[in-house]
Amino acid sequence: MKRLLSLVAALGLSVGLASNALAAYPDKPITIVVPFAAGGPTDKVARDLGEVLRKGLNNQSVIIENVGGAGGTLGAAKVAKAAPDGYTLLLHHIGMATAPALYRKMPYNVMSDFEFLGMVNEVPMTLVGRTTLPANNFAELRKWIDANKGKINLANAGLAAASHLCGLLFQQSVAVDMTTVPYKGTGPAMTDLIGGQVDLMCDQTTNTTAQIEGGKIKAFAVSTSKPLTTPALAKLPTLDSQGLKGFNVSIWHGLYAPKGTPKAVLDQVNAALRTALKDPEFVKRQQDLGAVVVTDERLAPAEHRKFVEAEINKWGPVIKAAGQYAD
């Protein structure tokens, strides 16, 4: 009987210690890995998020660690292999879903090596062109595209960039192959579009809105399924409404943890994320970036997981059909 009582007491003590450990989370700084260089859009989102996320995590410091390279797969791989204790998280964008198709030798499995914490924001995209194009709306642009097959240049910011992915889907949707012109970043691509050296580009509102407002490029449509409310873009039709049924592209960001992270920790981080995304200053900063903070069901881990899986299934065939790989 004494042995039994001792065993029960020991079990009770171990359970109590485990509960206390979870209750104390976090008791040290948390690291959010950004799989891209400092200063970029994803880095900016992570730093803004870290400032408000800490409020729901015992006010612990949130450290941003930039681990760039290989289209975001190096940083993601680091998190996949990290201790599943809630102290190493990943903030990634649409590349989380496109990497499995772009890279034929992946160092991790997106769907089985991570816990999904929730979606953070999404950035719409716009189809834009040089000001000397004869078209002034999408209907006219579509006629011009059909009349100039084999002569059209489509710029992007480089292999696997958002503008590259949107451009691939656009070409397949209009069933017209265009000459893809990859640049080393959005800056030089936009410079040549403004200068008239290339014809078209599909890029984030973060990069195009000011140029549209300044009359330096023409805007023909938005890539999202719903019209935008930004004054400079509110009158633009969606590509879906212009006959490209189902066309819906945005650059989104999500938060992830290593597989096996305790549910109690995941729940706490998700609760902190929900609170952070309601912070007025954070919302304003995202709006200034041209991003829309997520407030729908995709904030839930299970729903974000479904969303990412659907994105993988959407982009896989597009990338494979184009035969453009990153490795």
What does each model-identified segment do?
Residues M1-L4:
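Positively charged n-region of N-terminal signal peptides that target proteins for export
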Residues K81-T88, A101-P188, L239, W252-R285:
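Hinge/capping helix and adjacent helix->loop/strand transition within the periplasmic-binding protein
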Residues G95-K105, L169-S173, L200-L236:
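A ligand-binding cleft/hinge motif common to bilobed small-molecule-binding domains
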Residues L22-S112, K151-N153, L159, A175-Q204, ...:
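N-terminal (or domain-start) structured segment
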Residues P29, V176, S241, K263-D327:
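An extracytoplasmic/periplasmic, membrane-proximal ligand-sensing/linker region
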Residues K44, D48, V52, L74, ...:
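Extracytoplasmic/secreted proteins, especially bacterial periplasmic and envelope-associated proteins
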Residues S6-G16:
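Bacterial N-terminal signal peptides
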